[in-house]
Regions:
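RNA pseudouridine synthases
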Residues: 1-152
């Protein structure tokens, strides 16, 4: 915090072991507006995950239900990344807690390092918040990171 000149406000959360992109705002009003965009699904979120096995299809939409009977929906597409054979670009349509991890597990393709759903003992969960797109104050914003640096 000593390096940053502004107080920062967290505008969304990531699951504990998920790595990658997070957004912060420099003032409370903007933080509140961005948080509202997240809670009303007006922000497009993309993640990248690596698995030990592959899905039957290279691209698909998964629809499942969590223990509260709430619908979980995501789309995935197989992509090529350094160091991992089975990587997927994931677009979230709903944003429930542990959603990607749960849906991959329910569809028999758990994420590497997911101790909660797969018992996999790899030292790091290979799930990364990769890209966030939204419109605010009449402007479009797109933030993304290099997933090869995170999923190594």
């Amino acid at each position: 915090e000593n390096v940053i000149e502004h107080k920062l406000y967290i505008v969304h959360r990531l699951d504990k072991d998920t790595s990658g992109l997070m957004l912060f705002a420099k003032n409370r009003i903007t933080a509140s507006k961005i948080s509202l965009l997240f809670s009303t699904n007006k922000i497009t979120k993309y993640y990248i995950a690596a698995t030990n096995t592959k899905f039957n299809k290279n691209t698909d939409t998964l629809i499942n239900y969590n223990s509260d009977k709430k619908q979980l929906k995501l789309a995935y597409r197989k992509i090529q990344l350094d160091n991992h054979e089975n990587c997927y670009l994931i677009k979230l349509f709903t944003g429930k807690k542990h959603q990607i991890r749960l849906q991959f597990y329910l569809n028999k393709n758990p994420i590497i390092g997911d101790k909660k759903f797969s018992g996999n003992k790899f030292n790091k969960l290979l799930l990364c918040s990769y890209k966030i797109i939204f419109k605010l104050y009449g402007k479009f914003y797109k933030f993304k990171i290099n997933p090869n640096k995170i999923l190594s």
